[in-house]
Amino acid sequence: MSSENKSPLLERARNLVPHLETERHKGQAGRIGIVGGSLEYTGAPYFAAISALKVGADLVHVFCPQAAAQVIKGYSPELIVHPLLDSNNAIIQIEPWLERLHVLVIGPGLGRDRLILQTVAELIRICRQLQKPLIIDADGLFLITQDIGLVKDYYGVILTPNAIEFCRLFGKDRDQTMASLGRLGAGVTVIEKGLNDRIYDSLTSEKYECPQGGSGRRCGGQGDLLAGALATFYYWALESKQEISPAMVACFAASTLTKTCNKYAFKAKGRSMTCSDMIDQIHQVFDDLFEHKKD
């Protein structure tokens, strides 16, 4: 194992991974929900969902509008797709599923439809009552910029902004970043995506910069891959009896996996690399970095 694969955080992330034991049953390795998709954006929820599965979750449910459902189903038969997000009684139909899910990802491909955003805001409020761990990405973050109270003091929330989304949430003054993060209250973690991803813990005021940088190719969908991978790692971290900073370690694991997938795929495909090429590398990256090895 190379020296770069021996960092303390990577070792902690490796310890989260459940062993593949014959006694385990379907669902124990993670039941993940993806809330997103729209007529224009069907790829994003698919990328997030399939990444969660390929990292190791057992089941992934996608909650999307009717117009996106058939397309997403066509991408993969492994996904469970619910065309409910724009229905008149969306909350009534989706709420019973929430209890069954371990972690939800809110935002990939969601779009800005006013009524759907209202529905998603209500889902976030219900998830808070259920103490459901959330990862909020993409247009889910737009919703938070409109009402930061949705996640203030919500222990178990991870926000995943890129550089532009980060500035919208917290301003451009880097010297005031931690003070601005204080608006979130306690228990919210932020991973800012960039050349080197930065993880901020609003509870402890801890900051960590991930050393892995990937390649110069920035294809669309990488953030969705990270969000899906993060959901699986986060569930494993929350289930761990030893991990004292589950969100921090899960963010590090997802960032490292995503950047390394980028590096591997770029080596194979160069400038023509797409997110699908990165997803094809998940199995190899996971085996190299996270899988339990027999002595």
From Swiss-Prot:
Function field: Catalyzes the dehydration of the S-form of NAD(P)HX at the expense of ATP, which is converted to ADP. Together with NAD(P)HX epimerase, which catalyzes the epimerization of the S- and R-forms, the enzyme allows the repair of both epimers of NAD(P)HX, a damaged form of NAD(P)H that is a result of enzymatic or heat-dependent hydration.
Q: What is its EC number?
A: 4.2.1.93
Ligand binding (ATP) = 193-197, 214-223
Q: What name appears for this protein in its UniProt entry?
A: ATP-dependent (S)-NAD(P)H-hydrate dehydratase
* Gene Ontology BP annotations: metabolite repair; nicotinamide nucleotide metabolic process
Keywords assigned by UniProt, alphabetized: ATP-binding, Lyase, NAD, NADP, Nucleotide-binding, Phosphoprotein
Cofactors that this protein relies on: Mg(2+)
Task: Describe the family membership recorded for this protein in Swiss-Prot or TrEMBL.
Answer: Belongs to the NnrD/CARKD family.
Please name the InterPro entries in this protein's record: CARKD, Ribokinase-like
Q: Where is the YjeF C-terminal domain?
A: 9-289
| The keyword Metal-binding is annotated on this UniProt entry | no
Where, by residue number, does (6S)-NADPHX bind? Answer: G109, N162, A163, I164, E165, F166, C167, R168, D224
Give the species. Anopheles darlingi
| Xref: Pfam families | Carb_kinase
Q: Which HAMAP family match?
A: NADHX_dehydratase
From the UniProt record, list the reaction(s) this protein catalyses: (6S)-NADHX + ATP = ADP + phosphate + NADH + H(+); (6S)-NADPHX + ATP = ADP + phosphate + NADPH + H(+)
Q: Which GO terms describe its molecular function?
A: ATP binding; ATP-dependent NAD(P)H-hydrate dehydratase activity
